[in-house]
């Protein structure tokens, strides 16, 4: 991406790459709106494509989870692990289990986890995992 772009063109670029990931796009918008004045005053970070690296996970793993419920019925759920950044240490981030979980939500949470972990000053990167599995009422 051209290094002379505006905030809106950067956000449009993120939205176009993953048009159905509204939760993730909203998180990027909130963070970048805050960071943009600093980045305009410090162009060296933009020249290093720091923003493009921040908003693109290093790795996304999608897999199915097959299990047998209490009625002896086979169930299949989707699961993901989003590994956002290992720039300052190994990926660290929890798991979320809820029927509404999808890749956009986990990218949003992993993106935010990267910043939360960086603020601790401990050598931890950011990631998040989860599944659309509903744990309520399960044995």
Predicted segments, located by residue:
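N-terminal ligand-binding/catalytic initiation module
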Residues: 1-139
